[in-house]
Amino acid sequence: DCAGMAADIFESYEVTIVSGLILGLALVAIDPTHSLKWIVYPLIIRAIGVISSILGTFTVPIWESFPLKFLRAHDAEEAMFRSYEVSSVNTIFFSFLVAILYAGDWKLAMLTSIGVGLAVVFNPLTSYFTSTRRPPVKEIVKSTRTGPATTILSGLSVGMESSVWALGVIVISFIIALLLYGSQGATYVLYAVAMVGIGMLSHTGNNVAMDSYGPISDNANGIGEMAWHDMEDAE
């Protein structure tokens, strides 16, 4: 349940950094100062993302009993989302420090922030279209009462609608990247898109952990049922 998704996202994780490095090498040749910042900056951001993911993961247990009620998590999903947001804030903060103090170009940090924000938006978007408490899933459940045909059609329509929202958010992020570097040439635009991708996947560790939560909890529940445990133990 976990290996397939982890392998796929790890491939994307590596492809984005490789594309950023290749395009950065091209920009070194184009840049009159031959600055290595185009190559080094993606590596630094990737390192910041890894550290932020680790720090965010350690914050998961605290949200259930967090002092501020409006930030307190009511279930495991909310706790994971909070930890993801902690990682995101940390990455954005340090990306601006690196972009301004090292690279001397705040737009690089903006690209990273757009990518990180894109990943953050995906969490509630995914939850909305897959949670049993939300209208899309309730609509599919309701359609099962009238037969298999309506169930299939309802499921397909909800799936397609969720894809449209995800694609819309991605397109908006690409447009912003184009506006930031569009006047400097095609190579700069491609590099900007690569940096958005690097920012989006900077917390891959959190993503894999969140994906693994489902199979692990499901298997634990199955073991509990076979052991004839009560629902209180399952919770």
Task: Give residue spans per PLM region.
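Hydrophobic packing and interface segments
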Residues: 2-235
